[in-house]
């Protein structure tokens, strides 16, 4: 969670590790102050219990879903991951699960990810939509920019099964690149948690 001082009144807590959410919360509070004309302190409890689906959302312990699907969002995600790195176990691995749609600049996203996110393992897959990039193409792009192992899984379900099977307690998985991927993963992980 993130703590920050706001409005010279108190410490505000957000239940997120996303580096970009404190600014989003401040913007929301300022809007509410002007639109609703209520003191910001009344919103404190609400913020402390707010969750943002698909935004640095820990869907299961050590498995984070983030809707980063363009360069600004991937940059913000990378910043959040780097901030969390100091808390990861020394023998823990960082696993990336990635997919993208054809009309996004996924080549640039992949170059950036390889340069800025210290992944030990990268799993690529295809979203269940004709706009999804072939995972073999994603693998080739990643292979140009990293020495980390890149594993191809043909479906999101196979990718989900793979990362949950190989993830150890001390490992951290970040799933991003497509909102479709995050939505599919959320459904699959919710079903897995019920079993």
Regions found by a protein language model. Name each.
Residues 8-121:
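Nucleotide phosphate-binding/pyrophosphate-handling subdomain across enzymes
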Residues 27, 158, 180-181:
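Alpha-helix capping/helix-boundary segments
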Residues 34-35, 162, 166, 188-192:
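C-terminal alpha-helix
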Residues 76-78, 90, 109-111, 135-137, ...:
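Short amphipathic alpha-helical segments
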Residues 88-92, 168-170, 174:
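Short helix-terminating capping/connector loops at secondary-structure junctions
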Residues 98-101, 126-127, 176-179:
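Glycine-rich beta-strand-to-loop/alpha-helix junction loops that act as flexible
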């Amino acid at each position: 969670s993130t703590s920050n001082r706001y409005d010279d009144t108190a410490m505000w807590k957000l239940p997120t590790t996303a580096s970009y959410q404190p600014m989003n919360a401040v913007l929301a509070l300022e809007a509410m102050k002007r639109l609703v004309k209520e003191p910001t302190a009344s919103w404190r409890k609400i913020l402390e219990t707010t969750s943002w689906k698909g935004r640095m959302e820990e869907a299961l312990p050590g498995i984070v879903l983030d809707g980063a699907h363009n360069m600004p969002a991937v940059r913000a995600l990378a910043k959040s991951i780097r901030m969390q790195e100091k808390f990861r176990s020394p023998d823990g691995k960082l696993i990336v699960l990635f997919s993208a749609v054809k009309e996004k600049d996924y080549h640039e996203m992949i170059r950036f990810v390889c340069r800025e996110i210290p992944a030990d393992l990268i799993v690529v897959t295809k979203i269940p939509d004709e706009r999804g990039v072939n995972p073999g193409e994603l693998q080739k792009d990643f292979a140009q920019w990293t020495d980390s192992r890149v594993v191809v899984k043909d479906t999101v379900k196979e990718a989900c099964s793979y990362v949950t099977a190989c993830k150890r307690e001390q490992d951290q998985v970040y799933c991003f690149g497509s909102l479709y991927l995050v939505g599919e993963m959320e459904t699959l992980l919710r079903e897995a948690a019920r079993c």
